[in-house]
Amino acid sequence: MSQSSSTGNFDVASLVEDVNLRRVAQYALVVFFLGFFLVPLETGIMTAIKTNESVARSLPFAPPVGEGFTLGNIQFALEQLSGSFFNSLIMSIPATIGSVLFGSMAAYGLTMVNWRAQMGMLMLFVVGVFVPYQAVLVPLARFWNNIFPLARMIEPMVASIPFFQGYHAELVPLVITHIAYGIPICTILFRSYYQSLPNSLVEAGKIDGASITKIYRRIILPISKPMFGVVFIYQFTQIYNEFLFAFTLVTGSDAPAAPVTLVLPAIGASTSGINFGIRMSAAFLAAVPTLILYVAFAEQFAKGLRTEA
């Protein structure tokens, strides 16, 4: 009897020990990955608030001490990026809205409306997703600069808009390009969502005498809000961080219409070297708009991901 009890106690103790070891291993793994992702962030923050001399003398992740602490890097970077922030926003917001809205319409037409050559058109959208930026840079530059110089044509009109200058006309071809290039991926994302919707929604609208456009506007569009949040965040991040199209269509990083991605590489660089504190401050400031967007649309983003899953 006592032998059986001791055996039972030994088994329970072994089980508890195994569970504890497993839990310790899980927590250790979580802490490792947490540190793996947070240490570079902490290093960047420490670098942003150090003087250039303190950056050279101290460890990257060590906090600044005494005169090594400064907020001048952030102030200087903000002054350098203020104009380009406005340029990036007036480029990214309409381009994102256009590509997301047109992508939703195209996905609705390819999923919930039956018509001839539907699959062939879908294949064109799929091909459009995989066309690399580099393949269209030269024809794109020739089209907007030589064949159809839209920026020069609308410059007087743009200059008459409040808060805008004539040079902001350079961003209009960039907006159109991002809309055209973003529609395929937005269409594919929305199509996967619309495929999960029951066809009875469309059939009920048809029975009530609603047209195709009215069904989209009154039925499909309202229930697509979670997916709009997902696609809007994704597309805004892609457009805001894009470099190649901006580098091709805007005259240069010194141009008054240059977005953040063109101005950022030149900040903190001089003939005497690179000021890493200023450069890191600029990098963090450049990430603020996308961070605000993620926070603002966090609920819609989570709902969209759950719906997609």
Swiss-Prot record:
Pfam families linked: BPD_transp_1 (PF00528)
Induction: Transcriptionally up-regulated by both L-arabinose and D-xylose via the pentose-specific regulator XacR.
Cited InterPro entries: MetI-like (IPR000515), MetI-like_sf (IPR035906)
Membrane topology of this protein: Multi-pass membrane protein
Keywords, comma-separated and alphabetical: Cell membrane, Membrane, Plasmid, Sugar transport, Transmembrane, Transmembrane helix, Transport
Membrane spanning stretches: 29-49, 89-109, 121-141, 170-190, 227-247, 282-302
Main location: membrane
Family: Belongs to the binding-protein-dependent transport system permease family.
Functional description taken from the UniProt entry: Part of the ABC transporter complex XacGHIJK involved in the uptake of xylose and arabinose. Responsible for the translocation of the substrate across the membrane.
Record-given protein name: Xylose/arabinose import permease protein XacI
Gene source species: Haloferax volcanii (strain ATCC 29605 / DSM 3757 / JCM 8879 / NBRC 14742 / NCIMB 2012 / VKM B-1768 / DS2)
